[in-house]
Amino acid sequence: MFNTLVRAAHAAFAVALGAALLGTGAGVAQAGPGSPVIGGGSGIIIDNQFECTVTTIGHDAGGRLVGLTAGHCGEAGSEVWSEQDRGAGVIGHFVYSNHDLDYAVIQFDPGHVTPVNRIGNVTITNVGAPAQFPSIVCKEGRTTGNTCGLAFGDIFQTDETWAEMCVVEGDSGAPVVIGTTLVGMVNAYLAVACFGPEVGTNMSAIVNDMNARGGAGAGYAPI
C-alpha cells in the first residue's frame, strides 16, 4: 500500500510500505556472532509486515546505537527486523517518528546488530548540506538498489530536495548521498515511480530537529 504525502504544492505518493526506527539495547554490548549487518541501504521489516530502508546507523550523544528511516514507515514502539535475517528476531524499535519532516529514529540493540557504513554501492562517512542543482545524487534502496540522478534542489524551501532518481515501494528511508556524504533520505515520488521526481527530507533539517528535541538521536554521528 502507498502512503500519500503532501509535498509542497503536489501530492506525493510514499515509496514504501512501512517504517523502521529505534530498537532497545542497553550499555555497550557487543554484537553476537552472525548478527545481522545493518547500514544505510539495508532493508528492514517493521512489525513483521512492512518493508522500508535504513538511512544510516551510528551513535548519538548518549552513546545509543541509533538509525534513521522514513517517518511514515512506523510509529514509536514499532518493532524492527532485518530483512536479510528475520531469524535473528527483533533488532530494534522505533523510538520517535516525526510526520512533518517524515523521519523516524530507531534504537538498535547493539548485541543483535553489526553496524556498517557501507551497503551495496553506498558508503556513508559524514552528514552534509542539502544537494544543490546540478549535483548528481545517488541512493541505495532495498527494492531498486543503487540509482543516481540529477538533483533539482530544495525547490520550495521546505527542507525537501527533489531529484530525478528511480525509487519505488520499499525504498522509503534510503540514504541519498553525494560521494560519501549523506545529504538526505528518500521519502516519496511524484506521480509515477521511476519517472516522476523523487522527493526527500534534507539531512540537515533532520539533524537540527533531533538536536533541538534532545534524547535519542541528538548529537548523531554515523558509524
Annotate each language-model stretch with its function:
Residues 46-155, 178-179:
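Serine endopeptidase catalytic core focused on the charge-relay Asp
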